Regions:
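A short hydrophobic beta-strand segment most commonly corresponding to one strand
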Residues: 135-148
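His/acidic/aromatic-lined binding-pocket segments of jelly-roll/cupin-type domains
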Residues: 66, 73-76, 111-112, 119-120
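A short, N-terminal "cap"/entry segment at the start of jelly-roll beta-barrel domains
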Residues: 4, 15-70
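Short, conserved beta-strand element in jelly-roll/cupin
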Residues: 69-90, 96-105
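Short, surface-exposed beta-strand-loop junctions and turns on beta-sheet-rich folds
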Residues: 90-92, 136-137
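Bacterial N-terminal signal peptides that target proteins for export
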Residues: 1-8
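Conserved metal-binding segment of the jelly-roll/cupin
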Residues: 114-133
Length: 148
C-alpha cells in the first residue's frame, strides 16, 4: 500500500512539473472605452501578445518607407487622411532592426488616398509608406500580426 501511495504521489508530482513546463495560456485583453478614448488623445499601445501588437497611432507628417519581413500591418483609419503607397520596389533600403528595413522612396507602387473609415492590410514583405500626410494628421488603429 505504501508503494502505491508513493507511486501515486510521484505521478501527481510529475504532473505538476509537466504542467509547470507548459506555456501559459494566452490571456484575454480588455481595454475599456475610457482608455481607448484616452489613447485617441495621446496615441499609444492598446495590447501586446506573443504574435501581435495593437495600438492607436497618429501621424502629422510623411514617414519613411517600411518593409517588415515578419509583420503584417492592418490599419483602420479613424480620423483624417493620408496618401499611402504600397508594393513596388523600395529605394534606399537599410536594415534598421532585425526583420525591418527603412527606405526613402517606392518605385512602381500603388497609391491609396486613405480617409476616415478606410481599412488596409499590408502583408509581411510588402513596402509601404505614408507618403503625404496633411498638417491636420491621420489617426488610425493599427494591428501588427507577427508570423513565426
Amino acid at each position: 500500500m505504501r508503494c502505491a501511495i508513493a507511486i501515486a504521489a510521484a505521478i501527481v508530482a510529475s504532473l505538476g512539473v509537466v504542467s509547470a513546463q507548459q506555456p501559459a495560456a494566452p490571456q484575454v485583453t480588455y481595454v475599456d472605452a475610457a482608455k481607448v478614448n484616452e489613447l485617441f488623445a495621446k496615441p499609444g499601445p492598446l495590447a501586446n501578445g506573443a504574435d501581435f501588437t495593437a495600438s492607436i497611432a497618429r501621424r502629422t507628417a510623411a514617414g519613411q518607407v517600411e518593409v517588415h519581413a515578419k509583420e503584417t500591418d492592418i490599419f483602420y483609419i479613424v480620423d483624417g487622411s493620408a496618401t499611402f503607397v504600397t508594393g513596388g520596389t523600395m529605394v534606399g533600403g537599410k536594415e534598421t532592426r532585425p526583420n525591418q528595413m527603412l527606405g526613402t522612396d517606392i518605385t512602381g507602387g500603388q497609391t491609396h488616398q486613405l480617409k476616415k473609415g478606410d481599412f488596409i492590410s499590408i502583408p509581411a514583405g510588402i513596402p509601404h509608406w505614408f507618403k503625404e500626410v496633411p498638417a491636420s494628421g491621420v489617426t488610425y488603429y493599427m494591428v501588427k500580426v507577427v508570423k513565426p
